[in-house]
């Protein structure tokens, strides 16, 4: 585990070279096809050296939940173990890790008709009105979900309309816990400035690699928009806004870097409260040896 730009992929590839393991990606951005540059997806050479499972598995127009990830990850883990190898889970989507290790509440699946109904209400009344609705039926969830978080707000309302039970009621029950023993590592630089510099350097490298053209191709499709989870990935939203003429190029670069730093901060907040973690320093020469020592 680790924040974005902390060196997770590089360390994982080295582990695959030294240890009989296979990588399972735990990243909510890498699941999307045709989103390669802005997600820092491992390139062809890296994937040839160390294939990553659960990368490029859905179209950007599709939805993919933490429950979907848990189901798919468990299947991949079972397959890897059946061949006598060790699964190596690598990524920074903490909600996926949490869902995998702790199980999930038995929430209803997505209902497109209900989602369209909620979206239409939001268009007509505004998200604040829908947040007021949620406060009436589920004040606990309303306290946790900001009116400016349409994805979580819509999901809370959808759950209630589909099941007749609130999100708070349903989340009191968890599904099966993780059936395997794990050794958990987190990698990050101890100096936040180092991480900030890495984030800035990487985003500027993405731009040099053609990130703007990548977003242009996605934007040219008629089925993608900024309300989709795929297009809310850091960098993509800001570049889309630049291509729409809402912001200039320099502002786009600044906003994307700031958004990525904020993502890293949230990831680190999760990790600081995570139990039983073995911490690694980004770029340290002994990281590989430390992982090998604790994994025996």
Swiss-Prot record:
Residues that, per the record, bind substrate: 4-9
Can you supply a Gene Ontology BP term from the record? Answer: tRNA modification
Necessary cofactors: Mg(2+)
Q: What class of enzyme is it?
A: transferase
Where are the residues of the annotated region Interaction with substrate tRNA? Answer: 27-30, 151-155, 232-237
Keyword Transferase included in the entry's annotation: yes
Give the InterPro entries listed for this entry.
Dimethylallyltransferase (IPR039657), IPT (IPR018022), P-loop_NTPase (IPR027417)
| Site label Interaction with substrate tRNA, positions | 93, 115
The answer to whether the entry has keyword Cell membrane is no
Q: Which reaction does it catalyse?
A: adenosine(37) in tRNA + dimethylallyl diphosphate = N(6)-dimethylallyladenosine(37) in tRNA + diphosphate
Task: Describe its function.
Answer: Catalyzes the transfer of a dimethylallyl group onto the adenine at position 37 in tRNAs that read codons beginning with uridine, leading to the formation of N6-(dimethylallyl)adenosine (i(6)A).
Assembly and binders? Monomer.
- The protein's name in its UniProt record: tRNA dimethylallyltransferase
Q: Which organism is it from?
A: Shewanella pealeana (strain ATCC 700345 / ANG-SQ1)
Its organism's taxonomic lineage begins at:
Bacteria, Pseudomonadati, Pseudomonadota, Gammaproteobacteria, Alteromonadales
| Designated gene of the protein | miaA
């Amino acid at each position: 585990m680790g924040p974005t730009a902390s060196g997770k992929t590089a360390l994982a590839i080295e582990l695959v070279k030294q240890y009989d393991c296979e990588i399972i990606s735990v990243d909510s951005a890498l699941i999307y096809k045709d989103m390669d540059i802005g997600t820092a997806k491992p390139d062809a050479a890296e994937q040839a050296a160390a294939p990553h499972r659960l990368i490029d598995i859905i179209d950007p127009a599709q939805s993919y939940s933490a429950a979907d990830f848990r189901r798919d990850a468990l299947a991949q883990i079972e397959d890897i173990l059946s061949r006598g190898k060790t699964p190596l889970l690598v990524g920074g989507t903490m909600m996926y890790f949490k869902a995998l290790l702790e199980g999930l509440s038995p929430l209803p699946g997505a209902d497109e008709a209900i989602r369209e109904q909620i979206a239409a209400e939001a268009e007509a009344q505004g998200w604040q009105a829908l947040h007021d609705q949620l406060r009436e039926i589920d004040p606990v969830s309303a306290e946790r979900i900001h009116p400016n978080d349409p994805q979580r707000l819509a999901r809370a309302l959808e759950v209630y309309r589909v099941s007749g039970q609130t999100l708070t009621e349903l989340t009191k029950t968890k599904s099966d816990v993780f059936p395997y023993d794990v050794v958990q590592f987190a990698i990050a630089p101890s100096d936040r400035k180092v991480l900030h510099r890495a984030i800035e350097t990487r985003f500027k490298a993405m731009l040099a690699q053609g990130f703007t053209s990548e977003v242009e191709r996605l934007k040219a499709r008629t089925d993608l928009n900024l309300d989709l989870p795929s297009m809310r990935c850091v960098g993509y939203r800001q570049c889309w806004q630049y291509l729409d003429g809402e912001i200039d190029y320099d502002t786009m670069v600044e906003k994307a870097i700031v958004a990525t730093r904020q993502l890293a901060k949230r990831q680190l907040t999760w990790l600081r409260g995570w139990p039983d973690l073995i911490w690694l320093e980004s770029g340290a020469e002994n990281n590989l040896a430390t992982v090998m020592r604790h994994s025996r």
